[in-house]
Structures are given as structure tokens and as C-alpha cells.
Regions:
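Short, well-formed alpha-helical segments that are part of the catalytic scaffolds
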Residues: 14-33
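A conserved acidic beta->alpha catalytic loop
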Residues: 42-50, 67, 97-98
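Glycine-rich, basic loop-to-helix element that forms the pyrophosphate-binding segment
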Residues: 65-82
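Short beta-strand-to-loop acidic/aromatic patch adjacent to the donor-nucleotide binding site
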Residues: 87-98
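Conserved donor NDP-sugar-binding/catalytic core segment of glycosyltransferases
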Residues: 101-137
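Short, flexible, basic/aromatic active-site loop/helix in glycosyltransferases
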Residues: 140-160
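A short, conserved alpha-helix in the catalytic core of glycosyltransferases
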Residues: 167, 173-178, 183-210
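Non-catalytic, C-terminal membrane-associated alpha-helical segments of glycosyltransferases
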Residues: 249-307
Length: 307
């Protein structure tokens, strides 16, 4: 087996909100071996004991917001800080991501290859898989949509969009494409950015031979027709619906995707409401999300989690 080279000038960023201490510490410990700096943006204060342990990592820079500003603000703050500090690439993670040692250098080699082939890569992601030992159906890994008319290169596949977690970004391209939409707060931020990158002549890639364990939601909801969806908290379902509907007015979001969502969203709404027994606490955020998406009202959701 060939030895991996020293890491390229790469930083890592994590956006957290009341994280599981053990998972976050494992993530920081793994990343500290492969990157020059770790930026941790906290949307809520950390427990003092966790802060004390994190202080032992000299490469970690922690920033805590006064209130929950959302994932988009955290991602942008991290990207700007890494750019200011001279890093060329940035890998972004959720607080419960589970990369393995050496994963980022391996993605870096693949990124180098795509750049050498002049494929204009903006982002490259590992393939997210359910954590080992999880009961079947406890988490739904994302489905990746291969980009039509764009040939793969071995295990590297061009895809329409990527989840943020584990994804390696070219910071120059990120700045040129534009930062993440902070007004989305959470949900569909990565999807909108990837569609924007494609519209500007850049590309997004999946390294299908590089798995990374990651949990999406708190179980799955059957929708019929062989379809399932992740079970999320009601406010998350509301922001997902809001941001998806708002995306219909964006020219860089493909028409085919919009038409597919027109068919899929009603199925998701009914399946989510039925799963939660049509309780007002579940249906209310969905209705507000639909209303706000149609009206173009974005920002911090009124029923979002407090700090």
C-alpha cells in the first residue's frame, strides 16, 4: 500500500449545537492528525468540561455565538476564517460526523487528480453511510444523483449536489461562487450551493470508494412506493419545506429538480404528518414553512430551537 503524502494546506470546520461530547471529541481527535487547523463554530455554549478538554488541542480555534445563528452563518464564518489564515482547501463537518484517520489526505489526492484533469472541482465528498451497528432503518444515507452528461473518472462521480458533512471545498472557488446562504438557517444550504456552483461552470464530485459514517435524522419514515425519508424534528421539516419552496424561484436550480420536488413534497408532508399522528406540534411548523417559502420569508425560523 502506498504511503499517503503530508496533508495539503487544508483546514477543517465544524458547526455545533449542543453536541454529544464523546462524538465531538472523537471528531476533533481524528481531524487534528490530518489538518493544519480546526475551526469549531458553536451555536450554543459548550459544557465547561468539554471546553476544558478541547483547550488541549492547539490547532483548534473555537468561536461561540451569543445566540443560535444557524448552520449557514457558522459555515461562512469558518470559510472566511480559513481564507484569512491562508488555507487553500476546507473540509466541513457536522458535529456527529465520523471521518477516519487519513480520509482527508485521500480526498486531497482525488481533488488533485480532478484539478489536473481540468474538471473544475468545487467540492469533493466521501460517500456517507449509516454507522456500523445501527439497526436497519435507524438512519437513511443520502442518495446521490449523478450529473447528466458529465462522465465519471473511476470511483469519482460528478453529482448534482453533496451533503456538507465531510465535503472538501476549494476555498477560492467557494468565494467566487458565493458563500452559503445564511438566510436558509439550516437545511438545503448545501443543495442550493452545489446547484449554484454547477451553474457557474464548476463541478461537485463524490468519491464513492471513500465511505464516512454519518447519522441523518432520528430514524426513517416510510412513504410508500419503496420510498423513505429521514425523521427530523418538526422545526427542521418546516425549514426544509420553506427553503425547498424558495428554491423554486432561483434560476440556477434546475427545472427537472423543481418538477421532481413538486411530486415528492406532498408525499413527504403527508408521510411526516401521519408518522407524528397529525399532531399540531408537527403539522404547525410544516404549514408555517410552506407559507414562508411561498412568501419568500427566510431567516431564523420562529419555532427554531433556542440557544
Amino acid at each position: 500500500m502506498t504511503d499517503l503524502p503530508d496533508p495539503l494546506p487544508v483546514a477543517a470546520g465544524i458547526v455545533s449545537f449542543h453536541p454529544d461530547a464523546a462524538l465531538l471529541l472523537d471528531l476533533v481527535a481524528t481531524l487534528s492528525r490530518d489538518v493544519g487547523r480546526i475551526y469549531l463554530f458553536n451555536n450554543a455554549p459548550l459544557e465547561p468540561a468539554l471546553e476544558a478538554v478541547l483547550a488541549d488541542y492547539p490547532a483548534l480555534v473555537a468561536i461561540t455565538a451569543d445566540s443560535n445563528l444557524g448552520v449557514g452563518v457558522g459555515l461562512n464564518f469558518i470559510a472566511l476564517a480559513a481564507s484569512r489564515d491562508g488555507f487553500e482547501r476546507l473540509a466541513l463537518f457536522d458535529q456527529d460526523s465520523r471521518p477516519w484517520p487519513g480520509m482527508l489526505p485521500r480526498l486531497g489526492l482525488a481533488f488533485d487528480r480532478l484539478e489536473a484533469l481540468r474538471r473544475a472541482p468545487a467540492a469533493l465528498a466521501p460517500r456517507l453511510v449509516a454507522p456500523r451497528g445501527r439497526v436497519a432503518g435507524a438512519s437513511k444515507p443520502p442518495r446521490y444523483r449523478p450529473r447528466r452528461g458529465c462522465p465519471p473518472d473511476g470511483a469519482l462521480t460528478p453529482v448534482d449536489f453533496l451533503p456538507t458533512s465531510g465535503t472538501l471545498f476549494n476555498l477560492r472557488t467557494l468565494r467566487e461562487t458565493g458563500m452559503f446562504r445564511a438566510d436558509f438557517f439550516i437545511d438545503a444550504i448545501d443543495l442550493e450551493w452545489c446547484f449554484r456552483a454547477w451553474a457557474r461552470g464548476q463541478s461537485c464530485w463524490l468519491a464513492s470508494d471513500v465511505p464516512m459514517e454519518h447519522t441523518v435524522g432520528t430514524g426513517t419514515i416510510p412513504l410508500g412506493f419503496g420510498l423513505t425519508m429521514p425523521n427530523q424534528r418538526p422545526f427542521r421539516m418546516g425549514t426544509y419545506l420553506r427553503n425547498t419552496l424558495y428554491g423554486f424561484r432561483l434560476a440556477h436550480v434546475p427545472l427537472g429538480w423543481k418538477l421532481k420536488q413538486l411530486l415528492y413534497l406532498p408525499l413527504q408532508c403527508f408521510g411526516f404528518a401521519r408518522h407524528h399522528r397529525f399532531r399540531a406540534a408537527a403539522v404547525g411548523p410544516m404549514l408555517r414553512g410552506l407559507r414562508d417559502g411561498l412568501a419568500g420569508r427566510l431567516g431564523v425560523p420562529p419555532d427554531g430551537p433556542p440557544s
